[in-house]
Curated annotation (Swiss-Prot):
This is CFA/I fimbrial subunit C. Keywords: Cell outer membrane, Fimbrium, Membrane, Plasmid, Signal. The gene is cfaC. One of its GO terms (cellular component) is pilus. It is found in: Fimbrium; Cell outer membrane. InterPro entries: Pilus_assem_C (IPR031917), Pilus_assem_E-set-like_dom (IPR032636), Usher_TcfC (IPR035224).
Amino acid sequence: MKHKKKNRLVVAISVALIPYIGVTGDIPDSFRDLWGEQDEFYEVKLYGQTLGIHRIKTTPTHIKFYSPESILDKINLKKEKEKELSVFFTNSFSRNGNMSCQGNTTIQYNCNYIKTKSVDVIVDDVDNVVNLFIGNEFLDSEAHNDEYHQLSRNVKKAFIQSQTINLSDSGKYKRLSISGNSALGITDTSYAVLNWWMNYNKSNGYSNNEKTINSLYFRHDLDKRYYYQFGRMDRTDLSQSISGSFNFNLLPLPDIDGIRTGTTQSYIKNTDKFIASPVTVMLTNFSRVEAFRNDQLLGVWYLDSGVNELDTARLPYGSYDLKLKIFENTQLVREEIIPFNKGRSSIGDMQWDIFVQGGNIVNDNDRYIEKQNNHKSSINTGLRLPITKNISVQQGVSVIDNKSYYEGSLKWNSGILSGSLNSEFSFLWGDNAKGNYQSISYTDGFSLSFYHNDKRVDNCGRNYNAGWSGCYESYSASLSIPLLGWTSTLGYSDTYSESVYKSHILSEYGFYNQNIYKGRTQRWQLTSSTSLKWMDYNFMPAIGIYNSEQRQLTDKGGYISVTITRASRENSLNTGYSYNYSRGNYSSNELFVDGYMTSTNNGDYHEAGMRFNKNRHNAEGRLSGRINNRFGDLNGSFSMNKNRNTNSTNHSLTGGYNSSFALTSDGFYWGGSTAGLTKLAGGIIKVKSNDTKKNLVKVTGTLYGDYSLGSNDNAFIPVPALTPASLIIEDNNYGDNNISILAPTNNDMFMLPGNVYPVEIETKVSVSYIGRGFDPNGTPLSGAHVLNEPHVILDEDGGFSFEYTGNEKTLFLLKGRTIYTCQLGKNKVHKGIVFVGDVICDINSTSSLPDEFVKNPRVQDLLAKNDKG
């Protein structure tokens, strides 16, 4: 909480009054007003954890809580000790200011700490914080449990939803995907979740619409270790800590309408990071890559030629086939399917985890069920056991329509020599199906990775119980080595697929004979690049060779390119030239220019970009833009390509939007991007102010950046559920005003899905007046009380300095029984300060006081005391 100037004054005055403590009769008359009890607002912290802003009665030596029950409600206490502790809170407490760190951020020995068996406080007047200390016998032992996160107490139940829209339009090929994630808080330990998506597809005059509910279930957590849930469920949660971090690569786990129970890692205090199988794309030209799960568009990437790794942070959790569509010059040139697995890391958790689920299988595009009206049941279970802190084994069993499948896996993450090794080995055995999976990566100044996935059903037909058809095997490997200032990367992939169903083979695979469809693609690519800097320019030459064999088609070639970049903090301009030789497609050269501009203004992020490239056959231009703020993340691009040989023109349009909202018992609040979150919680920010200005408050710690809020603004700020999060409130001081904030500076939270953490912020916009006051005879009005603001007394030469939040331009003084009015004039405000100089004040009467002054108890008390005097 920020309101420091006044408190520094109080500290100084308190120090000045130390010689008079205990001898109140010797207190100078000019300080008696400050010595009395005052009402202040302080942030209260219990062992460093904020309990919010509370009204405190203060004197220079003691404090007293105005409303102890509002503080006790936010503390985990032993039930049998609540009454005894409430008695302590009715007492006054010594300030213990000498034990405060006084806002010092550097570590000091034993400051801001008292060991107590009852209740004690340390008042930090610099940061406006009351540090509260309570004896351990009063606190619930769970509140000090370092093993588990504690759920935030000051929360409200809400309905929270995020919505994502992705579209892609390439003329004859159109796709629109809309998806949503919802969470509803029900009790302190339970909630409901909904996940859905809709697709609209149109290609060559054929169109279809799809609607799917992936998840709709009720969940209840037990003792921070166990859970049960029932409803419709997919396998996404199983890959995350919320359901034990089970990452199965091969085991069939269908969507079910049923029940699941098991252990959870959500509350454990450990480093939570995602692990994902690599998605390597080898490109020979600048390309657009679209990623799909089933028919749902997950994201779009624009990538340069070379061996590229997709950013898997943008992809959802789970184990599924990732379909990649690769476009060059707005034309679809090939498709790839990559088995993908993404989950939370469980290595080193040093606890066992288990789950069991059962129910009726949901028809997932005929994946597990032959006909729409067929009904099958499924029972699945999994167990993971850590062997050491670096090794764990995982086992899973699925029984689908009385057919059994088993997957066993071992994960080993370790430091070897001076590098890091991450590996996973799995195998599957089951009814008419088998498979194996290996993933190994090693980094030690260089990077080496290997990936292999092999899945087969008998006779390469269709196994509805296993959930896949045909036989599929893929290898990929990459090696990246820095040498003599150059980085060289060698990538290799080999994919083989065989099926009796043509519809289950990608478009690049063709007819083999009357009964079998086969396809094989082998690719390797070697690239080498470096970066040279000269003044503000970066020169990036690159060279590469490649080989691609697909059915009876072979393409071999190479390319060389150079890119020149000039970049600043907010702008970038690139230009480059590339020459590509292909034995199959002859040679081509290409010139491109691209650039982008970004700006951030009061929490709003704006980005605009353009690219133009031209070769012997095609010319293409692309415009892109992005806006990200507290109302959502909107991005889009438009490309136009002209073929000089056919004189035809093609276009491509892509776009995306993500936002969120929360509905609570006291209102509707719109929010920004959820950045791919699947379990939603958030903060509700409400701003009140004595001013109408915008951009008074800055909120940091959000998913996309900073929020900037003004007077009477409300906002929902999404944060990940069951993950520690923090929202930091800061004043947005600018221009010619001071901004003071009455709110906790750091708001730490840990919440279930469907819960919101309310933060009410009161801001005061003020200016500081500095000058001297004189009576009509030119005599300094020393000792006069300023009626406009409390606790301000003119010094010996009539000097005054105070912050004022009102609009009144007249200074009202009281000296003895005389009221003076001083016109502050129209002096300019500079950085929140008005220097009024020497002011001649007129003698006036009580009738000259504004009504707000006359009705003010503080002013009434001063007038009464002076009348008696």
